[in-house]
Amino acid sequence: MIQTEKDIHSIQELYRQRAQEFQANSERLHSKYQRFALVRLLAFFGSVALIILIWQYSGLAGIVAIVVFLLAFYRFMTWHQAIKREQEHQAELALINQNELATLDHDFTMFADGAAYQDPLHPNSIDLDLFGPYSFYQYTNRTSTALGANYLASMLTTNVDSTTIQKRQASIKELSADLEWRQHFLAYGRKAEDTLEQVNLLKKWIKQAPFIIPNRLLRALLILMPILTTAVFAWFLYQQQFFFGVLSLLPALALLRKHVLKVNSVHEQTTHAEKALRHYALLIKHIETKGFETEHLQDL
């Protein structure tokens, strides 16, 4: 019993230290992001003023300055947003460790209880407290995506043979030894904010025939039209012929109008899943960083 208490205290200290470390990292990155947000604002207005000044001396030099500014500002924005994403990731890691600290005091309320998966017709769904408050599902639930939550419920309600059970136990043992990898994986998934409805819409979209790839002319126009439109528009602005500059946009608008219904249909099926897909990619990338030893994990 004394040894058990020592083990619990050691685990508590581990989670407490990790929570403090990740929280400190999050606060440091947040301060850095805020500082450079001001720099970004000043750089934007300063660059606009500089471009106006250059344009007064030379329209061509002004166009070059605009292109350089857009490229530089895009790179800066990308770097700045990367700081924000890492800050949010560190904050998630801090919260994960705080949650695990709470579980050592028998508080599992921060985890979904899976009540939606209760099935009165299932022989063990209710009488074994598989789902609902203080259920086995809530006790074991460390899923971070809708697909993961659904898969866990399926595992608890589907009979499997002893060989499969042994493979799962071996994979659990392997993963239990790598706290760092597990928590980063969980943190990436927690930001996905996916739903089964989004997943079903994506599956429906994937099964649809593409309307761009088979059309060679459309593929060529997708590449050439933005380049030509931008070049012609910039030339008319340089010549101060604004009316013709506006007219140069009409071919691109006509092409867009022709395909707008199809584009809107694709947008409807994918727009809400963009964030989820981005985080699915992070999860897959994180899986690829680890070489698994057990057969069950290698088959993923």
Predicted segments, located by residue:
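Alpha-helical bundle segments enriched in helix-capping/polar residues
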Residues: 2-300
